[in-house]
Structure formats: C-alpha cells, structure tokens
Amino acid sequence: MKIIEGKLEAQGLKFGIIVSRFNEFITSRLLEGAIDALIRHGAIEKDIEIVRVPGSFEIPLIAKKLAQSGRFHAIICLGTLIRGATPHFDYIAAEVSKGIALVSLETSIPVSFGIITADTIEQAIERAGSKSGNKGWDAALVAIEMAKVMGQLK
C-alpha cells in the first residue's frame, strides 16, 4: 500500500503570499505568522514573494496570476473580513472563498486559505495570534504540506 503525505519541510520551495491591506492591524499579524512558519520550516526569505492588495476581494485575481506564473510551489492568501450591519460581508466572504478554491483547481497549484471571517473585531484578533492561534501560520503550514503532496503526485 502506498501512502502519500506531505512533510512540513519548506526547503527549496517557493511561496507567493497575498495579503490584504484592509484591516491591516490584523492582516499584518497574519503575514508575520505565515512568514514565521515558512522560515521555521526551512524556507528562505528570497523564496517568499509578498503581494499587497487593497482588500480580500482582490486576492483571487492575484492568486491566479501568481499561480499561472509557474514561479511558486504554493500560494498563501491572507485577509480579514469582519461582519458589519449589511449583507456585504456575506457576498465578499462567499466570492473570495469560491475564487481562491477555483484558482487552485484551475492551476493545480496549492492555494491556502488564510482569510479570517469573523463576526467581531475581537474574534478576528483572537485568530491572528492570541487565543485561537494564528491563521496565517496555519495557512503557511497547509501551503507547505500541499506543495509536498503535489510534488509526489507528479
């Protein structure tokens, strides 16, 4: 029986990170977490490229562009959506999620989802490095593992 698993070893892998500037007081923590996870697992800074975009809605387009470039083993998407008084949150969250998934499926490049969707600012802060860990770190680990899995399936 053959079992394929990804190891959390980022040596030799190249990563694209897309980070939203909207809610930057939170997304900056996600970015720090993602970079820390990549470096601690063997990536080097020159193999990490960061693209800043205005908001989370813009992330899927840039993810597609980076994935199609052929320069990266995985793409990490980081953003924060906080529910407001209108349905805007629901539309943006749904479209960003669909867009990120579609990029991965269309390009066969792992695209990890580090987008916080929270009802309150407090919940978002908790997911960006306090009580609930750091979703940027988590997204980076997913990117490493999936890049390794995909490498074995070629």
From Swiss-Prot:
Pathway: Cofactor biosynthesis; riboflavin biosynthesis; riboflavin from 2-hydroxy-3-oxobutyl phosphate and 5-amino-6-(D-ribitylamino)uracil: step 1/2. It catalyses: (2S)-2-hydroxy-3-oxobutyl phosphate + 5-amino-6-(D-ribitylamino)uracil = 6,7-dimethyl-8-(1-D-ribityl)lumazine + phosphate + 2 H2O + H(+). It is an enzyme of class 2 (transferase). InterPro entries: LS, LS/RS, LS/RS_sf. 5-amino-6-(D-ribitylamino)uracil binds at residues 22, 56-58, 80-82, 113. The keyword Transferase applies. Its EC number is 2.5.1.78. GO terms for biological process: riboflavin biosynthetic process. It comes from the Bacteria. Belongs to the DMRL synthase family. This is 6,7-dimethyl-8-ribityllumazine synthase. It comes from Thermodesulfovibrio yellowstonii (strain ATCC 51303 / DSM 11347 / YP87).
